[in-house]
């Protein structure tokens, strides 16, 4: 499994953020796109220097860093800049790959967190390419999907309403995707055994091996 999708925020938390965004200043999303992807990006973003964006960054980071599955999957070292994006009917973002490096460091994992109620828009699915095919992801309000930044992905056209999301990038303690997945599987398996059978000397050895890897 090279991506994870789960519920991060409640509907109440999302609505609180959406209420904050009523007074936000929105700019052309192409300002933050690379030259090769700029023409295919049709959306708006909250100005990076705004206080509202900084407040949302803090809310999202605290929620992510306190979620056991996210910590296990990402082994996060740093959350880079967070963008708040609004895509209206007719907008989307053509196929692109995120930058491998940012001014604040390496970007190993990318994420999208849906703030809008799924009934507030149509279309706008996130499509991520794998080696053999593509995965089309539709997010409910408060759901987040995290995937390797090396994967080609696109936001399909929004056909009705407005899609408001947070997108961001994570630097992991492990750069290599295979290593991260192995650690995630080991941690998930060990915690599953602990929940099912309780603690044992053998399981302690598994946790010891995980810690020392």
Segments and roles (model prediction):
Residues 68-184:
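Catalytic core of non-heme Fe(II) oxygenases with the double-stranded beta-helix
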Residues 1-76, 81, 182-213:
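Non-heme Fe(II)/2-oxoglutarate
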